[in-house]
């Protein structure tokens, strides 16, 4: 029998006032439902906006549940649910709360400051149903089960919307997911404050890792059995309209949370390999993965210190704690498990690749080499920098001085260069 999905759950973690969230909600309520066979849509709003609650714990988003609001859309095929968090769960955990509570097997994740394309749900349904098509003899055209559909993402630029990201995107908004696959493979978002920003990456990496080792579950990319113009995803506003990027601490939040994500990914990979007997098979790939993430952590750590030392920025204590703890964890994983197998060329290649082919904010080390970082540590006043508390870190940063080229002027290489290039006498 040909498969026909019942409907799609759209999950949105909510914060901010209605002027922001209305656009997302209306983009869901105005979905094209299909001409002859309307698709059912469940919109699950997960209210994490505790600061916006009334004294009676009333949610601003209860407006979307009123009879007055229900007059604005097709309530036969669209249902709105509201879940109110009793404590902050932040973006990732709120998404997970939403899709676990959803009634349909398939779900889409959309942020409250994003919008879905008008035909997103109908296109996803068409692609999923097409995957399970049967011929006249009742035989499936495709084998296996469908875990997710990749879609396109669009962002708005100076000339309207433009093609932004296709395919293996790290943004969770770019896919429609099968909840059964997610649950079977223990794919989770980070928890606590690590769930607040930068949470997309570990979720997608875990999902893709499980997919790459599964012979039954598959993923397909748009376009699928259709023209190249099919647009099955979110219109996305990553810059001017992004609530998270309006946070003045956004960049340094990401420093610690990205490192927490790296640890979360590594731990998932290792647990998955152990569970499925893949430890020997994946050993070389894991060595490469841990080295990559530790090199990234090395540069991230340096950049954080430089940012504090050379600007007026005052980081949050929690951001420093998240950064130092998670960099320390990555360093320990690399040193304890893989370091004896790593050769000089591995390190040099990775340093180059992370520097030139990643989004890292590069800062040249004034403390020593990556080898020094792993084997000796970087010290100040007889204490490893990764063990400094917040106050000590601020004191240390006051001892640093960076020139216009981003070099720390007291570093050995800068001092050596100055000795070889003395300034000409002012009188000559």
Predicted regions and their residues:
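Acidic donor-binding segment of Leloir-type glycosyltransferases
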Residues: 29-84
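The conserved acidic donor/metal-binding loop of glycosyltransferases
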Residues: 111-115
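C-terminal subregions of glycosyltransferases and related glycan-biosynthesis enzymes
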Residues: 2, 227-428
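Short aromatic/hydrophobic "clamp" motif used to bind/position activated sugar donors
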Residues: 107
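Glycine-rich, basic loop-to-helix element that forms the pyrophosphate-binding segment
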Residues: 85-102
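Conserved nucleotide-sugar donor-binding catalytic segment
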Residues: 162-258
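Flexible acidic/His/Gly-enriched loops in nucleotide-sugar-dependent glycosyltransferase catalytic domains
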Residues: 73-78, 94, 117-193
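Short, well-formed alpha-helical segments that are part of the catalytic scaffolds
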Residues: 17-32
């Amino acid at each position: 029998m040909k498969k026909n999905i019942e409907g799609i759950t759209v999950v949105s973690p909510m914060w901010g006032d209605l002027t922001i969230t209305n656009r997302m909600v209306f983009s869901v309520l105005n979905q094209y439902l299909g001409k002859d066979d309307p698709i059912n849509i469940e919109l699950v709003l997960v209210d994490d906006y505790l600061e916006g609650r009334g004294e009676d714990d009333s949610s601003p988003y209860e407006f979307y549940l009123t009879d007055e609001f229900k007059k604005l859309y097709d309530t036969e095929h669209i249902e709105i649910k509201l879940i109110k968090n009793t404590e902050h769960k932040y973006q990732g955990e709120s998404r997970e709360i939403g899709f676990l509570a959803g009634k349909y097997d398939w779900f889409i994740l959309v942020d409250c400051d994003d919008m879905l394309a008008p035909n997103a749900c109908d296109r996803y349904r068409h692609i999923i149903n097409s995957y399970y098509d049967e011929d006249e003899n009742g035989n499936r055209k495709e084998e296996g089960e469908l875990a997710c559909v990749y879609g396109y993402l669009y962002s708005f630029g100076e000339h309207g919307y433009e093609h932004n990201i296709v395919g293996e995107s790290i943004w969770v908004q770019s896919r429609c997911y099968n909840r059964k696959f997610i649950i079977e493979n223990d794919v989770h978002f980070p928890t606590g404050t690590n769930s607040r920003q930068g949470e997309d990456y570990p979720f997608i990496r875990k999902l893709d890792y499980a997919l790459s080792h599964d012979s039954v579950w598959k993923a397909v990319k748009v376009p699928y059995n259709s023209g190249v113009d099919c647009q099955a995803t979110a219109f996305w506003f990553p810059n001017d309209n992004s609530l998270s990027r309006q946070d003045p601490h956004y960049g340094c939040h990401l420093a610690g949370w990205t490192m927490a994500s790296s640890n979360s990914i590594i731990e998932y990979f290792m647990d998955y390999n152990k569970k499925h007997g893949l430890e020997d098979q994946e050993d070389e790939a894991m060595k490469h993965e841990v080295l990559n993430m530790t090199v990234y952590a090395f540069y991230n750590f340096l950049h954080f210190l430089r940012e504090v030392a050379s600007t007026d920025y005052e980081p949050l204590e929690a951001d420093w704690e998240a950064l130092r703890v998670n960099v320390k964890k990555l360093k320990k994983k690399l040193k304890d498990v893989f370091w004896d197998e790593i050769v000089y060329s591995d390190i040099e290649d990775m340093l180059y690749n992370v520097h030139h082919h990643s989004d890292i904010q590069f800062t040249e080390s004034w403390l020593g080499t990556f080898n020094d970082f792993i084997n000796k540590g970087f010290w100040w006043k007889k204490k490893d920098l990764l063990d400094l508390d917040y106050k000590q870190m601020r004191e240390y940063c006051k001892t640093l001085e960076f020139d216009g080229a981003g070099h720390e002027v007291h570093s050995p290489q800068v001092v050596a260069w100055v000795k070889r290039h003395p300034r000409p006498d002012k009188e000559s």
